[in-house]
Amino acid sequence: MNKTLIIVDAQYDFMEGGKLPVEGATAALNNIVEFLNSGEVSTVITTQDWHNGKHCSFKEQGGEFPEHCVAETHGADIYKPILDAIEKNNLLNFSLYKGKYLEEFSAFTNRTEGYAHWFEYATTDSTDPYLQFHEDEQVIICGLAGDICVMNTAIALKDMNVVIADNLTASLNEDNFRKLADQYNITIVEV
């Protein structure tokens, strides 16, 4: 079975000490590195919150969150050991930026102009085999934060063979993460 790993928002601003820290983020991201080195994954999709400096989700603009993941800042960068593991293992990697102007929790509601909407390619009759999910493909979703962007990405793909890797994910609210998984019938596994 082919396995695609979707790594959601593994960015410095979501790690402990970041601008919007998720407890357990460093451990989850280090587990992702180990999984990338395991040889079990053939394709990786990385997503990044990629906000402008006056993003609608920021408290200063009337939003819910502190400023975080501003484009072209260190806080918006993906955790370097993950990028190193992708390169070391020569994994096919697609990168998605989300939320430049609008609030986008799911990687697959990406409306950020200038960036390809990967999901449209993945679910069509694309002739490029790397841009198409197959019936026998397992999609493993992980990253930060489990109860927000990871869960919304899983919900967008819930009709596919998709699971969330619990040991590769950290949540702001673990109870909410579990309730949402039950509500939307999303399978949570250890990998």
Model-identified regions with their sequence ranges:
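Active-site-adjacent betaalpha module
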Residues: 2-6, 11-13, 18, 27-43, ...
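Substrate/cofactor-recognition hotspot
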Residues: 23
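Catalytic-core segment of enzymes that process non-peptidic bonds
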Residues: 48
